[in-house]
Amino acid sequence: TCGCQMKEVINEYNVVPLPVTMSEQQGRFYLNSDVPIVVNASQEVKHIASGLSTTLLDIAGLKLKPTDELHENVPSIVFDSIPGMEKEAYKLSVTPQLIKITASAPNGFYYGLQTLYQLLPVDVYCKERARNAEWSVPCVEIEDAPTFRYRGAMLDVCRHFASIDYIKKFIDVLAAHKMNTFHWHLTDDQGWRIEIKKYPKLTEIGSQRSETMVDYFYTHYPFKYDGKPHGGFYTQDEIKEVVAYAQSKYITVIPEIELPGHALAAIASYPELSCTPDSTYEVCKLWGVFDQVFCPTDTFFQFMEGVMDEVVELFPSSYIHIGGDECPKYAWEHCSHCQKLIRELGLENDITPNPVDGRKHTKEEKLQSYIVSRVEKYLNSKGRNIIGWDEILEGGLAPNATVMSWRGVEGGMTAAKAGHDAIMTPNPYAYLDHYQEEPEIAPVTIGGYNTLKKTYSYNPVPADADSLVKQHIIGVQANCWAEYMPTEDNRDYQIFPRLIAISETGWTPMKKKNFTSFCNRMVEDFQRLEAMGVKPCLNFFDVNINTRATQEGVLNVELETFYPGAQIYYTTHGEQPSIHANLYNHPFPLDGTYDLKAAAFVNGKQIGKVTHKQLYKNLISGKKYEIMPEPKGMKGDILGENDILGADTVTLGLTNGKRGNNASSTPWVGISPDNNDKVTFIVDFEKATIRKIRFGTLYNAAGGILPVS
């Protein structure tokens, strides 16, 4: 077979995302070329059913035959349309004599078929003929429908370009996991990736950058570059091809055209779109946020309307994403045209907080709201609505806008309370460019630390949300920003398996979600991903090493693997772990300096790589402390201050037995002293005798991180 064979499947009902109800039954349905497919539904559903016939012919060599009549005592597959079900809902019944998918709309039939595929041998996802597979389905009764109507994933192709083949593979995985939206980030400072025939320079100039910065943003100062041109764009024919491909899998493609910030690629192509049109610009070759933004002149609005005219012809989505994030106001503050426009519009700095978000907004923030509202009005005239990142709340929200909440959950909550739809994509959970395993051993990325477990734990609707908020939080999305993903393998590693966790959050009722169950089902889903050509992060099979303090101040070492039923063996003095090493049963106290190595084993065989961590015991290990001024942002707990390990977790970034490193700033405690004055650290040593105090600091001048003197 072509699927991954190194891991043992836990059970036969490994459906991801988990259905609303699933009742396992006795027996199996056996497939052979005598099995007919009966479709009592529309021509579109017949086309869906033909996909099953084609797949089984190509992969299994089975020639299932379509027919219009169901005959008694003949094992059959039936697609049966009934009225009254939700658009994406379906029922799947499997008995020894009958496989029956019931739905009201083609979307439901398609999702029922995806569940059926997941109950078949994993070989059904292969690209070539399977060998030695038993083509049968375990008997089951399933009733299913999604929790949220919007279940999306965003792919950034501006920082690093992605091929059409990769885009299609990405869509395949979304569809297999019942996600229904592909958010395509097509324009940014580092590249313009969509052909606009009215403005050819956007791709002649804007799609190419001369070189790209290397390593992490703050590693080198001055910055270093690779000296290699990077570029690419999608022709309108290619975009039509992708949109049609996605539609065949019941996925809507939403394009993102960034404005008014993240505009350098467009400004490099047409400098007259900026506040300083006589300046010379280039497509950006480093990462970050830049002052060069669109200037709200008649020229800009004519340009954007021309761009949107072509965009709406290419994308039938009811939504167009207009970005709206990270737009510095410096250029507008120093632009005579912008200041004149601000006066003409009567925009002023707020004296009292805005009633919607409780903030005082500047006149320049209100100018951004004017720009967004004007573009929205134009798109509304074309029958489209806009989505924007949560910054579009600042200065006033456009009348019909949907907010995509990325800087935490507050933006989405604010929008929902104001009666606007919101899509939740908070970076502490849903940003797939963040680390998912220890930064020391992982490929360099932007920062953060979102484990599979943490990503899975997210609930888009807070437990105390009122009915208005519940009504307007319409879904969830995973975001994949590609600054540190120069290859498609890098993308796969960052995206998977965490995207699958987001798929379950979007589909499965929160009360049904269970991380242990998810991990059981993920063992086979890793095989599906491999069969589909995906190369995911395999931290799932490794051991995570954590420390946690008890309320009594004892610092315990905790070892965890996501692989269900695996045994963890460890050593404390640098030896390679084996089944003859220490078997981990429960947390143990850190009572010395440990050169800890651990690995997971199943049936006596190691399944992942060895995890290595040095831990240190000293007089303040596990002790609580106070820091003044209070740390903001970086608090030293790599798992996050609201860690899912439990409410009794004590955040002890400075006394957790771990040393910081240069791989990431996340494990460090970051402090901004008032007036560049002193930092006060208070800890109770109790009765200990102190002979020496040592501390370490992170020094990174390029990042504005300075050592303590």
Question: At which residue positions do the language-model features occur?
Answer:
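Contiguous, structured surface segment used for ligand recognition
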Residues: C2-F148, N490, T505-R528, M532
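Short, compositionally stereotyped local motifs that mark structural "simplifiers"
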Residues: M6, P17, T21, V38-N40, ...
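Feature activates predominantly on carbohydrate-active enzymes
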Residues: M85-Y319, C335, R374, Y378, ...
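Residues within well-ordered beta-strands of beta-sheet-rich folds
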Residues: T102, M154, H185, T252, ...
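Active-site beta-loop-alpha junctions enriched in small/polar residues
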Residues: C158, T187-G191, E258-H262, D325-K329, ...
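Active-site neighborhood of glycoside hydrolase catalytic domains
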Residues: A266-P271, V283-K285, F290-P399, W406-T414
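Flexible, acidic glycine-rich loops studded with aromatic residues
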Residues: I386-A401, S405-N556
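Aromatic, loop-rich ligand-recognition surfaces of beta-strand-rich domains
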Residues: R659-S709
